Each structure stands twice: as C-alpha cells, then as structure tokens.
Amino acid sequence: MRPGGALLALLASLLLLLLLRLLWCPADAPGRARILVEESREATHGTPAALRTLRSPATAVPRATNSTYLNEKSLHLTEKCKNLQYGIESFSNKTKGYSENDYLQIITDIQSCPWKRQAEEYANFRAKLASCCDAVQNFVVSQNNTPVGTNMSYEVESKKEIPIKKNIFHMFPVSQPFVDYPYNQCAVVGNGGILNKSLCGTEIDKSDFVFRCNLPPTTGDVSKDVGSKTNLVTINPSIITLKYGNLKEKKALFLEDIATYGEAFFLLPAFSFRANTGTSFKVYYTLEESKARQKVLFFHPKYLKDLALFWRTKGVTAYRLSTGLMITSVAVELCKNVKLYGFWPFSKTVEDIPVSHHYYDNKLPKHGFHQMPKEYSQILQLHMKGILKLQFSKCEVA
C-alpha cells in the first residue's frame, strides 16, 4: 500500500471512532442512569421500593470543562430530588419495613435539595383545601356561620348535638376575625425538641402571623429558639384541667401565664367532645371577667370533620387529626407563605443526637420507632412540592 493511502486509512479510522463516541456517550448517559435505577429496583430485593428509588445510582459526570461539570451536577441533583419526591409519595401509603434511620436518611437527602416556592402547586393545593373546607369562612365558629337556633353536631361525638342559644351565640365573633387576610408570611411553630439551640426565634418573630400549639412557653432563654410573638395559640382543654385546676384555685396562675401572649387569639375545641364544652366556656368567661387582652375562638366542628375527610383521601386515617396538621391546613389557606418549625417526630437528629419530645421538657420519646406518622409524610410532600417549607435544623442567623 502506498504511504499516502495508509495515512488516509488511519485518519478515516480515527474519525470513525470519534463519531461513534460522540453518538454513544451524550445520548446514552441519561438513559443508562435510568436503566441502572430500574435494574437496582429489580435486583435489590431486600430494600423497600421507596428507599431503592431514593438511593438510585448516580450518573457519571463528564469533566470536560467546569461549566459542563456544574451543569451535569445540577441536572443530576434535580433528577435525584424528583426521585426523592416519588419515594416520599410511595412510602406515605406504606410504612412497614422502614426504620427510623431510613427516614433520617431521607431527611438528609431532602436537605440537599434546594427548596423553592412553587406558586402553581401552592395555588392548586390551596384551591382544593378551600373547596372542601374553606378555612377563611368556616375555620372558627362565628355568628355569621352559626345563627341562633342551630343544633350543632359535635366533631367526634357526631350523634350528639348542642343547641346554640343566645347565651352561647354571644361568645362568637360576628365574622372571621382575621382582618389582614391573606397574611404574607406565616410561621406554624410546633413544640418539638428539635427547636432547642435552633436560634430560630428572630426569624419566627419576623413573620406576619405566628401560630402556636397548646400554650407553650415563649419567654426567657427559650425565646431565642422559639420566638416570643404569638397571634394565635391553641389550648387543649386537658391542660386547663390538669395544670390550672379547671380555673378554680389556679385561676390567678393561668392569668399570669397567658399575659405573655399579648393580644393573641386563644383557640379551643369546644365542640369536639361534650367534655370539652364546659372547660372551653370557662376559659371564655375567665378572660371576659378579668378583662384580658386575648380573645377566645372555637374550632368549628364541621370544618374539622371536612378537614379530616380531606386528609383521609390522602391516606391519613388517624382517629383524629393532630392539632399541628389542623393548624398547618388553616395556615395554607390564610397565608401566602407558610414555614413550619418544631415539627420532628423522631427520637434523634440526623447527626444521631437525642431529641426531647418537647422543647420545654427533657422527656425523650418512647424508645423504638415503629412507623413514620402518616401526617408527617404528607407534610414532607408539601415541602418537596414547594407548597410550604419545613425547617429541619438550625436557622441562619445574620
């Protein structure tokens, strides 16, 4: 063969190899990652399906240039976060076979995903809530939605009714009292021990409206972690009975304790159980007699029934919704932006540090973890979809 012909043949071979490489690598890389995920799902028989999805293999990242590498890394993170959302949705309906450590790994993965509010997701979810429940009009009992003569059914003891006579009717506000609705930024503050040393107090207090649950402490050293601002706080009637002696001999202590809440609304489930009614009314009359700055509101039992039905369609089948999920649902309807603090159903942090059940006591949760609360998995989904934001760890302090 002539020397020139050999050189041409060599160049042709090199061009062919280069062409094959260009055709093979870019087009195949994403598909290859998907195949690996599917193969992993089929081959990993000992791992629950949702966790296999969340642990799908990483795509090999080409390092031709810094910009290419960063773009590929960003795309991989996006794909990982989409898989994560799918995994959360799948385990929300099936919790057997998962350990607490599995869930903490999922939380760790969630924290690696950048959070961004998704206006369309928020609007769609809020519209569904409003269609079923309408917190804006029906969240609390008012003179507008409950006229004199109404036979009101209890939320849980639904076969029992209470007639709304004038002496009860005058306890209700004329209309819904949330005059600045919709609020721009709302904080729903749970009581989880994860708030200890979080330094979230300043951030919470900057919110336009702050919801709290069951008269938690907000003064002293804890304020740097939980804030002190309160616009609405729920009261479980049992705390009135157990801590404040049904407002008989400990009425003065109750009035002293509630002074820290300023002009907040006190929200009670007066019409959930018949046993709650008298105690809730006692709180109303105690505040009225003492000319306290706080105002008493009552959960509307029909709103709570409708809300329970709404969440039941999403797999939450508990005997009764937690106060935290009730208030979170209300906040989504009343607020444009919702952030949750102190929601943590685990016995330890992702760093394996024990967490007390409440931020104001040293009691640890019962040993062992049987299943992740269905409610919390729903809240995680709302976080992943950009409908609300969960604060998992310490807050950033300027």
UniProtKB/Swiss-Prot annotation:
Glycan attachment points: 66, 93, 151, 196
GO MF, one example: alpha-N-acetylneuraminate alpha-2,8-sialyltransferase activity
Alphabetical keyword list: Disulfide bond, Glycoprotein, Glycosyltransferase, Golgi apparatus, Lipid metabolism, Membrane, Signal-anchor, Transferase, Transmembrane, Transmembrane helix
Gene3D superfamilies (alphabetical): Glycosyl transferase family 29 (3.90.1480.20)
GO biological process: blastocyst hatching; carbohydrate biosynthetic process; ganglioside biosynthetic process; N-glycan processing; oligosaccharide metabolic process; protein glycosylation; protein O-linked glycosylation
A GO cellular component entry from the record: Golgi membrane
Disulfide bond entries: 186-335, 200-395
Topological domains annotated Cytoplasmic: 1-3
Keyword presence, Transmembrane: yes
Recorded catalytic activity of this chain's protein: a ganglioside GM3 + CMP-N-acetyl-beta-neuraminate = a ganglioside GD3 + CMP + H(+); a ganglioside GM3 (d18:1(4E)) + CMP-N-acetyl-beta-neuraminate = a ganglioside GD3 (d18:1(4E)) + CMP + H(+); a ganglioside GD1a (d18:1(4E)) + CMP-N-acetyl-beta-neuraminate = a ganglioside GT1a (d18:1(4E)) + CMP + H(+); a ganglioside GD1a + CMP-N-acetyl-beta-neuraminate = a ganglioside GT1a + CMP + H(+)
E.C. no: 2.4.99.-
UniProt pathway annotation: Protein modification; protein glycosylation
Catalytic residues (UniProt): 370
Pfam family, one: Glyco_transf_29
Protein residues bound to substrate: 214, 236-238, 322-324
Cellular location(s): Golgi apparatus membrane
Lumenal side stretches: 25-398
InterPro entries linked: Glyco_trans_29, Glycosyltr_29_Sialyltrsf, GT29-like_sf, Sialyl_trans
Topology of the protein relative to the lipid bilayer: Single-pass type II membrane protein
Transmembrane parts of this sequence: 4-24
Functional note: Alpha-2,8-sialyltransferase that prefers O-glycans to N-glycans or glycolipids as acceptor substrates. The minimal acceptor substrate is the NeuAc-alpha-2,3(6)-Gal sequence at the non-reducing end of their carbohydrate groups.
Similarity field: Belongs to the glycosyltransferase 29 family.
Protein name: Alpha-2,8-sialyltransferase 8F
Protein's organism: Pan troglodytes (Chimpanzee)
Lineage: Eukaryota, Metazoa, Chordata, Craniata, Vertebrata
